[in-house]
Structure formats: structure tokens, C-alpha cells
């Protein structure tokens, strides 16, 4: 029997498993509420269902009349309203149930953010106009073209523009409004919010509930061969 006949399949299998290794991704949370069209955006757009993993460095988008809630590994709850886009820029684990560093970019749409068990300094939330630092916080965040609104529901937060103009939110209802007009960015503070996430909560059952993360410790999603077999199994 020609030795090459036996060696080639083995070498090919090794190469196929090694090549996608970079594609293996870390599970950092899971979807607990999915209403209508919710997708992850990468090289291809794929739908997300309840129970699906939330992966490090991924972008999530909701469609019109759609909503979603994700629970991260540290029990942070992220709720998205219709036509929202969220990017997990960075997640660095401290241990299996907390983060040392997590950066979340809320590009467009309406969101509710409830902190989990990580140190509050670990969280960095950004919109195109603002950077938000949290301290034991429930926040409603609206990101629109030329305008961001940050409403404190509980805890405290610091909201800064990209030019380091900052306001401190310390009382429920405290609101930072950041606007960009003609290239000039300004920030104001009020205790009369022009908007909150409450209407989204009322429209979608479970969207604004708060759950602890029930999954196992963060796991690596193995690369899968074309025949559906897991490499290394």
C-alpha cells in the first residue's frame, strides 16, 4: 500500500484543524431574550437564538421591531432596543465570573446596561460621542447620529465627551446629553430625562429583567471541520 495514501489524509486533517484555530472564540455570555431579528455581524451575518453564546470581539445588531438581552459571564445584563448595534471591543477575564477589563461600544440605538460582579473600574462604555465610566450602575443609553443620552437609573457614573468635558451622574434621573453640531461637541446635565429605556421594557417581556449568569465558566468554542466533526475529538 502506498504510504502517501495513508499520510495525506492525516496531514490534511492536521492542517484543517490548525488553520481555523484562530477562529476559535471565547464564550463571554449568552442570549436570554431574543425578539424578532437579532444577528451577529462578521464575515457573514448569522441569526442569534435564545441560549446562543455571546462571543468575544463580536458585533450584535437588532432589526426594526426587534430587541435582545444578553447576560455576560460576570452577570452584566445588556438590553438592546430596535435597530441597535453593539460591539464588544475587548473582554479580559479576571477569573471565570469577573472581568479585569471590558469595553463595550454602543454604536447606534437604545440600550440598558446593568453592571455585574466585576470591579466597576473594569467597564468602559463608549458611544461615538461619549465615554462612560460606571460605579455600580444601571444606565439607559441612547446613541443617535449627532446625539447621545445617558440616564442614570441606579448607582453613579461619569460621562465625558471625546474632548474630556465631563459630568457626574449621582442621583436617579441624572442625565447627560451630548450633542455634536458643526463639529462642536457639547455636554449638558439635567435631572429631567428627555428619554428613557422604559418604553422598550414595556414592549418586550423580559427585556429589562436582570439575571445572574447561569452558564459554565467561559469556554473556547472549538473549530469545526466541514464534516461537522470537532477537531481533536
Language-model segments: residues:
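C-terminal interaction modules
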Residues: 1-24, 46-49, 73, 81, ...
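Structural recognition of beta-strand segments within beta-rich domains
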Residues: 29-179
Amino acid at each position: 500500500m502506498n504510504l502517501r495514501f495513508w499520510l495525506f489524509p492525516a496531514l490534511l486533517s492536521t492542517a484543517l484543524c490548525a488553520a481555523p484555530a484562530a477562529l476559535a472564540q471565547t464564550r463571554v455570555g449568552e442570549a436570554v431574550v431574543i425578539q424578532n431579528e437579532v444577528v451577529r455581524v462578521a464575515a457573514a451575518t448569522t441569526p442569534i437564538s435564545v441560549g446562543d453564546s455571546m462571543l468575544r470581539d463580536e458585533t450584535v445588531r437588532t432589526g426594526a421591531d426587534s430587541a435582545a438581552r444578553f447576560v455576560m459571564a460576570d452577570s452584566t445584563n445588556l438590553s438592546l432596543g430596535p435597530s441597535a448595534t453593539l460591539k464588544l471591543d475587548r473582554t479580559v477575564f479576571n477569573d471565570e465570573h469577573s472581568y479585569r477589563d471590558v469595553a463595550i461600544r454602543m454604536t447606534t440605538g437604545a440600550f440598558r446596561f446593568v453592571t455585574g460582579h466585576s470591579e466597576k473600574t473594569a467597564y468602559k462604555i463608549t458611544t461615538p460621542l461619549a465615554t462612560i465610566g460606571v460605579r455600580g450602575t444601571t444606565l439607559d443609553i441612547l446613541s443617535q447620529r449627532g446625539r447621545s443620552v445617558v440616564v442614570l437609573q441606579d448607582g453613579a457614573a461619569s460621562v465625558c465627551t471625546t474632548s474630556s468635558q465631563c459630568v457626574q451622574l449621582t442621583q436617579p434621573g441624572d442625565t447627560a446629553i451630548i450633542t455634536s453640531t458643526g463639529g462642536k461637541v457639547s455636554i449638558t446635565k439635567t435631572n429631567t430625562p428627555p428619554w428613557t429605556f422604559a418604553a422598550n421594557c414595556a414592549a418586550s417581556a423580559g427585556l429589562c429583567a436582570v439575571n445572574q449568569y447561569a452558564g459554565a465558566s467561559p469556554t473556547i468554542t472549538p473549530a469545526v471541520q466541514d464534516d461537522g466533526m470537532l477537531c481533536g475529538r
